[in-house]
Amino acid sequence: MEKNNSFIKTIGGKIFAVLAIAAAIFCLAALYVITGVNAGVNNDKNIILDDGWSVIYNGESYNDVNLNNFRLTKTMGKGDKVVLYTSIPKNFKYDTPVIKIPTTSSVLKVSVNGKLVYTYGEDRYAENKLVGSGWHYIPVKKTDAGKNIRIIITSTEAATFSSIDAPVLMEYSDVFQQMMIKNRVRYVSAVSLIIFGALIMALAGIMMIKTKGMSRLFWIGALSVTVGTWTACNYRLMQLFNIPLPVTTTLEYINLVLGALSAAMYFKDNVYELKDTLMINLYKIFVGCLSVFIVVSFTLQFTNLYHLPSLLEVIHVFIVLEVIYMMVLMITSY
């Protein structure tokens, strides 16, 4: 027993030292990013293309549309298509102009004056593969000013979106800086969660070899990693490293589901300490159903029979049920 206590104290000291160093690095990184010199980047230079659109959807035409206020009559389903028309502004002065267009699990086609200049996802959709979600940067020429632009968005999954984010005309050289400035807190948080979680999981794994009761620490680490990875994917940090959209989207949904499992496993000891038969049985049913869902959904995802984005509503149901259960558990415990 004395040997085990000595081991725990030694490892505990190492954990504290590692986390203290990591926390210091995090604070310095956060301070650097938040207060960094960004004088050369000006978001005001961007031209938001939100007004004056013509939209064709579900056989209906809408003119002089402001995309900020526009909502589709129903949520886009698999195979649904929306077409948007407008003119490229004449007053931009960019050296390397691009139009930033966000999409959610959709095929994208962009034409300028009837000439196709950009396409994404058509081949993957034809093969029933995951297309993915993210930002697209469509290059345009200075001579394209004033020309007509047509955007065709085709949904590849069930229940993808019901509103359309306004495209943005901007300078390509500002893309990276603007992404970092706008999302710097999220990015630092995501990276920190992943690093902290990985360290905790590794240390907990080592400690579990010598002593019991370290599983909660392991699941804290797992939850930290999944939340950090989901954040990085959801806010498009992965695109900074040119990771393909299908990979980013797959990681986003996998970590969303595994995060729910990690949280459930963390509370396992609390559930059994109550010695409440009903709560224990409900916990077993929930974890069992979630585990089956993970196996089935991941199998469907990687065999391209059915993709995780189409199961988002089911995932949300699991998360809501888990939150309700955890609230009841905490109330019952205290």
Regions found by a protein language model. Give the residues of each.
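Extended carbohydrate-recognition surfaces in non-catalytic/accessory domains of CAZymes
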Residues: 5-93
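Membrane-helix interface motif
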Residues: 37-38, 161, 232-237
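Extended low-complexity, serine/threonine- and proline-enriched intrinsically disordered segments
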Residues: 45-60, 106-116, 167-168
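Intrinsic-disorder/low-complexity, polar/charged segments enriched in Ser/Thr/Lys/Arg/Asp/Glu/Gln
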Residues: 79-87, 96-98, 135-137, 148-150
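Aromatic-lined ligand-binding clefts that engage carbohydrates, nucleic acids, or primary amines
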Residues: 93-112, 151
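Beta-strand-rich ligand-recognition modules
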Residues: 108-148, 154-166
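Cytosolic-side membrane-insertion boundary helix
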Residues: 165-211
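Juxtamembrane segments at transmembrane-helix boundaries
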Residues: 191-334
